[in-house]
Amino acid sequence: MNTLNQQYEEKVRPCIDLIDSLRSLGVEKDLALPAIAVIGDQSSGKSSVLEALSGVALPRGSGIVTRCPLELKMKRKKEGEEWYGKISYQNHEEEIEDPADVEKKIREAQDEMAGVGVGISDDLISLEIGSPGVPDLTLIDLPGIARVAVKGQPENIGDQIKRLIQTFITKQETISLVVVPCNVDIATTEALNMAQRVDPDGERTLGILTKPDLVDKGTEDTVVEIVHNEVIHLKKGYMIVKCRGQKEITERVSLTEAIERETAFFREHVYFHTLYNEGHATVPKLAEKLTLELVHHIEKSLPRLEEQIEEKLTQTRAELERYGNGPPSDAAEKLIFLIDKVTAFTQDAISLTTGEELKCGDRLNVFSMLRREFGQWNAHLSRSGEIFNKKIEKEVEEYEERYRGRELPGFINYKTFEVMVKEQIKQLEEPAVKRLKDVGDAVRKLLVQLAQSSFTGFPNLVKIAKARIEAIKQEKESTAESTLRTQFKMELLVYSQDRTYSSSLSDRKTEEDEEEDKRKVKTFHKERSILYRMDNHATLQELMLHLKSYYKIASQRLADQIPLVIRYQMLQESASQLHREMMQVLQDKENLEFLLKEDSDIGSKRAALQSRLKRLMKARAYLVEF
């Protein structure tokens, strides 16, 4: 750390403290924080590297020794200041007086969280260490990757560990510190493979080579090439360190002495002295690089972090608003609370049916559905008219033969006209009723959605509202169906104002004349249609004009009238009756407790949201003050 200039050194601790403070608040539950995660295969020397950086002994041995994610917060103190330590997990927090107790305390924490034995846990243990001999740095140590389950471990222990590691290194905010022994083929290490899968360009991966003293003779050049980034390229490059081996631990070689031996090893090594001279070797150089990388990473991440906190705050407030504050304890206040709830719901129901904005904030739109349904009804009438026109041309002669009485040729048979019109009108009745039922179902669905939104967390209120909505839907649908069927009975009377009918007939004649002119050009030398070869073709032509003209009037009438009936009963009347019936619910004061009984988990959800809001607001305050 001595190579850092004073100005930069003053920025280091505040940056790291900021993220540590956010993590201690629990903000990591809500969004990803900048971090360095240490990963490696079992026996890669990962624990030894962390020991060398922190100056304290950590759990080590064969098998899985890191069984929970360990947040290692190192704080560099001034020379002469005392060492201190603190361990925190779940609801437990304990100061550590002696550095020699750290390993024991971590094992106790792991047993508490992952069970005694060899299981693992996703829960974080936080270890804070302050000492003049440590860098300003925070790392997250993750369990070593196990290839084969040992006695007492679940068969899928390897998959469990990989899933845990994946949750950390997948985040773009995480730098992966991959620990690899020098005496293995780097390309085959699972830790590096995992890092490459989530970070194929090596943008946020840093390689650490360990155990350089165990390299096979003749392979030293390969190690140098790896550190020089010539084998598997990583943007952040590689470092190489030599930590205490088991022999040195047995001989009680101190960490300070181990670092001195490490420096001598690299400085004097035939092949590795170049790495030492280039600043790629030793634990102190690694500490310096990691601190610089973390601070740079934090500074780079801060703008996005601020945005994420604002987004989460907005989202959390919106969710809390949906859950509300919960019912008050005082009976009189409870009644007021219920009245407000029910009134807001019924007002929103009326607003929904009139196209106004809802107070609950939901974006429910009944009129987009109505436009679609009524548009389809209009399209059905148009298609029916086209089919009717074609049918007229085919069957009008047959009807004339069947229904013509004593009239001389050239006289229009009104009975023929009436029979054909009635037959066509009848075919529209059931499609109109189906349209009513489709709209009724859609309106009920929207009102139920509104009830669930308005009475979130109050299942009994939702149940009562749904029952009322269903009963009203059945009643209004029945009334509307009766009105529709009456409308179709009236349509069988075959009536229109003279002026309206004359206008429609005139328009139709003009259209027919234009079509006839076109047809004459095309069929000048051809045989004319059967209609024009008939002696009474003028009569039949006239009858067709009347039929088409009248159907146009009737269909226009139905295109408006059917939607009006449906809209009036299923929207306006339904909303008004729902308002009246929900107001009646308020008269039953004895059921107050029943109506305001909350979901069993609603209180815990509200508390969780309030807790999230609190920590996010604190997090924002930290960022503002930074």
Swiss-Prot record:
Region (G3 motif): 141-144
Keyword Kinase in record: no
Xref: SUPFAM superfamilies: P-loop containing nucleoside triphosphate hydrolases
Subcellular localization(s) per the UniProt record: Cytoplasm
Region described as G5 motif: 242-245
Gene Ontology terms, MF aspect: GTP binding; GTPase activity; microtubule binding
Main location class: cytoplasm
Gene Ontology CC entries for this record: cytoplasm; microtubule; nucleus; plasma membrane; presynapse
CDD domains: DLP_1
Protein name as annotated: Interferon-induced GTP-binding protein Mx
Organism, as annotated: Siniperca chuatsi (Mandarin fish)
